[in-house]
Amino acid sequence: MYKRQPQERGVAVLFGDGAGACLITADSGKAEIVDSVLNTDGSFSEDLTLECDRPIKMNGRSVILQASRKIPAAIRSLLEQYSIDPPDVLAFLMHQANQNLIDRVADALGVPSAKFFSNIRKYGNTSSASMLIAAAEWSREFGFEPGEPVVFAAFGAGFNWGALLARGV
């Protein structure tokens, strides 16, 4: 959990307030998790750091550049394992860092931006809660369809990134 500090002028204006949670059970629900990939590249760890009782540090240009390269690669590698082409995915639910990143990932995958649910203009970047808030809104507005793939993708401090493939049941 991240708490904004007023003295963090360089990043405080970037983040909105939000929280999210996800319930995973053995019972049948709206969707099932098919598979996931998670990656770490410590060579970029200084570009996005969050330490206990210290202000967040972020090199925004480097973070967006790395995320716009690494997230599409993670999504592609995950989808290839299941012979799914990116345009055949029902929806992409990403960490809502900024609209530019979402559009760059869509372009890199050759998918219309409309398939990438976005609420960044409504809430801003709510940090680790952003993808869960987006998923909850998308689920209420559109929802999972039986058998249809949905991709979740995010990145964060350390430098970590990953993707998760789900299917509607």
How would you name each of these model-derived features?
Residues 1-2:
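Short, small-residue-biased leader/transition segments that mark boundaries at the very start
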Residues 6-69, 73, 155, 168-169:
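Condensing-enzyme catalytic core mediating Claisen C-C bond formation in acyl metabolism
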Residues 8, 41, 56, 77, ...:
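Preference for short coil/turn "hinge" residues that link or interrupt alpha-helices
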Residues 40-51, 74-78, 82, 143-160:
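A broadly tuned preference for mixed-charge, low-complexity surface segments
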Residues 66-82, 133-138:
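Short, well-ordered amphipathic alpha-helical segments that serve as non-catalytic structural scaffolds
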Residues 83-88:
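Short, surface-exposed connector motifs at secondary-structure boundaries
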Residues 90-169:
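Claisen-condensing/thiolase-fold acyl-transfer catalytic domains that form or cleave C-C bonds
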